[in-house]
């Protein structure tokens, strides 16, 4: 999904960053991974994730020796333009046979990294944009699809990081790890941050929810839609002085804006014998549901029904009915999907009463908090039975 469309650097990017889980536990794949990534001819920076650990290590001290032998330090910084990039290793491994509660690792920035970061930022102008890259999110409001809501910081000593970042007014955080959700948390006074609010962005995944999940396409590749309804994809981060705009490019990749959102009727029109999707009788409680991929609470979404004017849709945190339907249809099969999880990028509105028989069109326009605009459309047919 990733390598072929990026050969030749069609987006003209300066470099790439992989925020952890470079491979899935098998560290012997690093050489092959590097060879494949080199085909894109794009400079790559890497961070270790929880799937890049030497699990036989007795503690955190030697957990990343294999990673370091292939990619270098696990935490570092560099400048590019007016941006100071900081990569931190916040995956703390308990050690072989040990655990932090019910997990063999936790989100935690070691003290020696915090000391290094304070010294590093002491030499950085307060006017620069600071981009913090970690594997485990700094903070998120996502859940795991099983109603376990991560309501606090995913990185336990997040507050210690905030203290070091206090002199800076332009910050953006990027992280991976969560294969169920993308989420943008505005870090503000409610988190103990008194400066200019900034975004801690848990990114949608290149691999999606995981390789063994979903239907198999004609290439033999599994559909890897995430539990929040995001397709798998990658990001092009665009920088303008001290501003960053994250552009999520979903699979299948391309510039077509209609690929950036999905429109669903929930519940769907009542199916008729021999009927097709979005053709049938309407329910009194049918809603139009839009999943704006990688969107968030500060984005705006409008619906246009047939020739009608713009109607603002209502933001809501809920599961995506499209994912619910896939989960239900393919449960207990070789093509089963992961359970639907609360999504941070859903908007809905009631399907208007009084729509007559025949074809109807829903057109969607969106504008995200960064000023990016998307459009999409869906037709449906009401049958009077």
Question: For the regions a protein language model found, what residue spans apply to each?
Answer:
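N-terminal active-site segment of His-dependent metallophosphoesterases
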Residues: 1-31, 384-385
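Conserved acidic residues
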Residues: 14-16, 130, 171, 347
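Short acidic, glycine-rich surface-loop motifs adjacent to enzyme active sites
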Residues: 19, 121-146
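Extended active-site neighborhood of metal-dependent phosphoesterases/phosphodiesterases
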Residues: 27-126, 148-174, 178-240, 244-248
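Aromatic sugar-binding surface patches on proteins
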Residues: 42, 320-350
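Binuclear metal-dependent phosphoesterase catalytic core
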Residues: 190-295, 299-301, 350-352, 361-381
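Surface-exposed loops/turns
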Residues: 356-357
């Amino acid at each position: 999904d990733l390598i072929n469309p990026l050969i030749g650097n069609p987006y003209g990017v300066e470099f790439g960053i992989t925020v952890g889980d470079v491979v899935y536990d098998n560290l012997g794949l690093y050489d092959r991974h590097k060879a494949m990534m080199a085909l894109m001819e794009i400079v790559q920076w890497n961070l270790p994730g929880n799937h890049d650990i030497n699990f036989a290590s007795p503690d955190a001290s030697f957990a990343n020796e294999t990673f370091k032998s292939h990619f270098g330090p696990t935490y570092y910084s560099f400048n590019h333009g007016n941006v100071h990039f900081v990569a931190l290793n916040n995956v703390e491994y308990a050690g072989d046979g040990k655990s932090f509660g019910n997990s063999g690792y936790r989100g935690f920035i070691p003290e020696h990294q915090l000391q290094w970061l304070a010294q590093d930022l002491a030499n950085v102008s307060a006017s620069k944009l600071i981009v913090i890259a970690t594997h485990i999110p700094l903070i998120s409001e996502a859940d795991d699809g099983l109603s376990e809501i991560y309501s606090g910081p995913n990185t336990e000593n997040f507050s210690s990081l905030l203290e070091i970042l206090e002199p800076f007014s332009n910050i953006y955080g990027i992280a991976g790890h969560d294969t169920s959700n993308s989420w943008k948390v505005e870090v503000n006074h409610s988190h103990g941050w008194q400066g200019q609010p900034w975004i801690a962005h848990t990114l949608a995944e290149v691999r999606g929810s995981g390789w063994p999940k979903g239907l198999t396409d004609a290439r033999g590749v599994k559909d890897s839609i995430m539990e929040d309804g995001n397709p798998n994809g990658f990001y092009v981060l665009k920088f303008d002085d001290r501003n960053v705009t994250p552009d999520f490019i979903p699979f299948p990749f391309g510039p077509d804006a209609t690929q950036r959102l999905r429109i669903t009727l929930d519940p769907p029109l009542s199916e008729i014998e021999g009927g097709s999707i979005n053709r049938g009788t309407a329910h009194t409680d049918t809603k139009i549901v839009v999943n704006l991929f990688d969107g968030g609470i500060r984005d705006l979404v409008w619906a246009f029904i047939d020739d009608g004017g713009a109607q603002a849709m209502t933001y809501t945190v809920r599961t995506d009915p499209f994912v619910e339907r896939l989960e239900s249809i393919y449960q207990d099969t070789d093509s089963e999907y992961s359970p639907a999880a609360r999504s941070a990028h859903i908007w809905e509105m009631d399907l208007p009463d009084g729509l007559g028989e025949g074809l109807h069109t829903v057109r969607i326009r969106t504008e995200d908090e960064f000023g990016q605009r998307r459009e999409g459309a869906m037709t449906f047919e009401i049958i009077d039975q």
